[in-house]
Amino acid sequence: MDINDDLNINSPVDNKNVVIVRARKTNTFFKAFKVAPNIWVAPERYYGEPLDIAEEYKLDGGIYDSNFLSQDSERENFLQAIITLLKRINNTISGKQLLSLISTAIPFPYGYVGGGYSSPNIFTFGKTPKSNKKLNSLVTSTIPFPFGGYRETNYIESQNNKNFYASNIVIFGPGSNIVENNVICYKKNDAENGMGTMAEILFQPLLTYKYNKFYIDPAMELTKCLIKSLYFLYGIKPSDDLVVPYRLRTELDNKQFSQLNIIDLLISGGVDLEFINTNPYWFTNSYFSNSIKMFEKYKNIYETEIEGNNAIGNDIKLRLKQKFQNSVQDIWNLNLNYFSKEFNSIIPDRFSNALKHFYRKQYYTMDYGDNYNINGFVNGQINTKLPLSDKNTNIISKPEKVVNLVNANNISLMKSNIYGDGLKGTTEDFYSTYKIPYNEEYEYRFNDSDNFPLNNISIEEVDSIPEIIDINPYKDNSDDLLFTQITSTTEEVITHTALPVNYLQAQIITNENFTLSSDFSKVVSSKDKSLVYSFLDNLMSYLETIKNDGPIDTDKKYYLWLKEVFKNYSFDINLTQEIDSSCGINEVVIWFGKALNILNTSNSFVEEYQNSGPISLISKKDNLSEPNIEIDDIPDSLLGLSFKDLNNKLYEIYSKNRVYFRKIYFNFLDQWWTEYYSQYFELICMAKQSILAQESVVKQIIQNKFTDLSKASIPPDTLKLIKETTEKTFIDLSNESQISMNRVDNFLNKASICVFVEDIYPKFISYMEKYINNINIKTREFIQRCTNINDNEKSILINSYTFKTIDFKFLNIQAIKNFFNSQVEQVMKEMLSPYQLLLFATRGPNSNIIEDISGKNTLIQYTESVELVYGVNGESLYLKSPNETVEFSNNFFTNGLTNNFTICFWLRFTGKDDDKTRLIGNKVNNCGWEIYFEDNGLVFEIIDSNGNQESVYLSNVINNNWYYISISVDRLKDQLLIFINDKNVANVSIEQILNIYSTNVISLVNKNNSIYVEELSVLDKPVASEEVIRNYFSYLDNSYIRDSSKSLLEYNKNYQLYNYVFPETSLYEVNDNNKSYLSLKNTDGINIPSVKFKLINIDESKGYVQKWDECIICVSDGTEKYLDISPENNRIQLVSSKDNAKKITVNTDLFRPDCITFSYNDKYFSLSLRDGDYNWMICNDNNKVPKGAHLWILKS
């Protein structure tokens, strides 16, 4: 699939790729551009919606601008943006398959009557089509076509109605609301009856928004629309009434459900869809089974009447072939989760259209080219900086409720807005009226496979399909345009008790000159609104302590102040306290209760939580709705069956009932998700908003201080450095905030699970007992009435087919925990990865490849003479000539005052340095960090912009050996840790070190010696001993040998030795002709003790065995002996002197890494073939010995 990018707004009309066409059912004309077969772009506002909307019809969160996309420059930007997004989608295999299917999934043609498919009304075809090659071939066919052929519905027509252009989708600009994306079907009936119809996409590529910390990728938004268009092209659009409960709205006890369209739920991905996939019977409706039947109906017509019909052109047949080899189940299983992985893109964790209830969107202007290309955001979704759109001033604010907080005298203190989620609402309790069908016919199991649903698409085949040139138009291919306008009202409610939304509003800055206060009542009662509510106690205490100090008028004073502000914020926002509840230990940030007035307890949140439990955090505590269920009685027609037949029938009924009970369990699980967990999720979102509000307050305090400082007599260069350092600290503040958000996630997810375990699941069991007891009674009575079985057989059947407690243990709490844990762990891929640089080097066929695989797009430049040689566990950089350099450039490397970092690498130095010689560093103007050689040792030096310096000398690393160096800088603890291999060799305070802002370049340099560097990495966090040890041994995983338990094989430790062929039979010592040998225990009935094996290191510095190590093997059964090789028979013989032992090479097998090989002079130790009662351990190259006999296993 090629995307035609040779287009611009001024491309001349050629009636092929650039056309002027009529909008359906109108006299409106627009210019359309074919970017791929059957895929068109119209850089215009959508013609089907008015651009001028009365205020009462404007929707909350929308932006209405009738002038948008009215200029050629805007239309050109729109066209190029859509082309870029389509190329980005097409840049991946799955995206290419999606576009290929959209291109080929043509609606089923009207008028085909050859095998039983007839037009709903063949007399609506319009005039007889023009003569063309395709129709001429059809007329001569023996199959009767009405008016000589079939008609196609997927086309756009020229303004003179003479030319028709094949089209499956047309991508327009937005309609009335310029920030609302939508997909509209051409003909509703065909979109639902299996015929299929073309689609129009309304899309806004020039604006995006943020969710949490990342920008929404417009390619993912367009993909969502493309997937939805497939529902229309396949004719499987569900009814607009097919909705499911999404969340329970509980503001001020007004019970109402939000409803989510099933298509949006299936497509959106995120935790909603993942939760469905943990719940295979989550939804039952005839839509699924009916859609499958319709698909099979048209597929059968295609296979029997079209596929082998030579009268029909390949442009139609081959497209239908591609369409029908992908089932409707494949379409249902398409969701954004697949594409987010393919595009390496982050998506919202909940249904994105409903997120405006939790997050008020601000829009940013997309910059295609500089900040975004076919690989996505150039600097990633988190680190990209896009300008706020000037259209944000036009965002419509229509809250669902206004909460008026009043005091005891009913005087209004503040008004806070509660916004809707943009979904339809209903007061009907879905769960109390929903009947769980006993019949499995309408049940649909969602696919939980990791395989991409469109793998059947052959891109090569699609590319070879001829384009549809001649169109036989079916004129009635579209509905009349309908534009429904909806009004909304705002309800005002009065409360005397402050709600979380009031607490949130009190944390928002409304005055440039503000003061922090922990007294909420004082904040909301202040007349000038100069107080801002805060729970950052340590920070407020610090600011209060220094308020009478002298002015901050030097860079050093500012750095000291900024460092303390950062430390106190980090401490306040991330300090946690353990809560011991009935569900175990949970950990909560201590500010949680105060931030949102949760439990209305001020400082006693933990105590109240322990007393009341996690259910107290939400408003819904009444009983669950019990579902309507129906279970068929056992039919009397079975009474006379034989024991065998009756047993089979009862087993079928018993199994069906168990499945039905599982559906009931999932109904309870879904109620918890919709009615309970949705409230915990709302708390998560509000807590995150509170964190962001506090972060904004702190940033404003810092900004104000910087503004004051800029008025002092500070040199411009110094002031510039302060500004850049401050911006770096702002990033560090955001990182601390994200850590706190993750802790809130974890706490509330655990709380919600606890509610399910303690409140919901027991009610399910209680509910089931009523029905199970009744079923068991009826089952016993039925079996007792059976006439063709004896009493013993009746007893067997009763015992087999009456339900017991064990049959209802559906709860898999670990699966639910894993589900939530995975969500917390995958918050943001870019943020979770601590690596700012992870060096990868390999030798290519024509040149060396040296690149960064951290995902942070580090630019690497190096001297051409730099070589790659095998090092510890892979290719290492070998710098042997003077002044060879490797430079790594990335803005992440610009350290400042508050950011943590770690540098790790393997180093081998083969020279000698008495003078100071630089190795690697990030330093400019004598500020930053540096590692250099001096006095035959290694020195790490860190120096700030004020001249404060700390140096650590490391000896014993210049001796031709490999060493793993880890240097960790923790600015919160003011701690410098240095590790060599797995040992901590330095722990130094760096409290006096302030700003080390230097450059975005890390340079690796060789001056006069030969150095080897491998696995160079830079992390954005400090590391502790445990992590260094884990990394050290993990990297050596391929070079270190392991025992049978996969533990590192140790020198001087006792093991038992087994052969791969006989893994349960150990070796023992055998005396033969006054000599000692080793053999398997083949003598039955004799208790012969196994001998112990011990590998003795030749290199005494080694504690663990590595590949290709030479060692001496000691054997002990009370007396130590050593392995030698008999020159007479090549057997392994035991000698008493270590001096006479052979130095044996130890290795692992390439294909069985858990097995060990021993060799001497390139000959391997193996088991001999059976020799009487013995299989000797021998050393030879006898190829008759089975391969496995050369492999050994050491067990501790």
From Swiss-Prot:
Keywords assigned: Disulfide bond, Secreted, Virulence
Region listing for C-heavy chain nHC, in residue ranges: 829-1195
UniProt subcellular location: Secreted
Domain comment (free text): Has 3 domains that are structurally very similar to those in BoNT/D; light chain (nLC, equivalent to the light chain), N-heavy chain (nHN) and C-heavy chain (nHC).
Record-given protein name: Non-toxic nonhemagglutinin type D
Subunit details: Forms a highly interlocked heterodimer with botulinum neurotoxin type C at pH 6.0 but not at pH 7.5. Botulinum toxins are produced as progenitor toxins of large molecular sizes of 12S (M toxin) and 16S (L toxin). M toxin consists of a non-toxic, non-hemagglutinin component (NTNHA) and the neurotoxin. L toxin consists of the M toxin and the 3 subcomponents of hemagglutinin (HA). HA is composed of subcomponents of 70, 33, and 17 kDa. Erythrocyte agglutination occurs when the entire complex is assembled.
Organism: Clostridium botulinum D phage (Clostridium botulinum D bacteriophage)
Record GO biological process: proteolysis
InterPro entries given in the database record: Bot/tetX_LC, Clostridium_toxin_transloc, ConA-like_dom_sf, Nontoxic_nonhemagglutn_C, Toxin_rcpt-bd_N
Protein family per UniProt: Belongs to the botulism non-toxic nonhemagglutinin family.
Other comments on record: This protein can also be encoded on a prophage.
Residue span of region Light chain nLC: 1-408
Region N-heavy chain nHN, annotated ranges: 409-828
NCBIfam families: botu_NTNH (NF033911)
Matching Gene3D superfamilies: 2.60.120.200, 2.80.10.50, Clostridium botulinum neurotoxin b, 'coiled-coil' domain, Metalloproteases ('zincins'), catalytic domain like
GO CC field: extracellular region
Gene this protein is translated from: ntnha
Disulfide bond residue pairs: C583-C754
Key word Secreted present: yes
Function: Assembles with botulinum neurotoxin type D (BoNT/D) and protects it against pH-mediated inactivation or protease activity at pH 2.6 (the pH of the animal gastrointestinal tract) but not at pH 6.0. The non-toxic component is necessary to maintain toxicity.
Any one GO molecular-function label of the UniProt entry: zinc ion binding
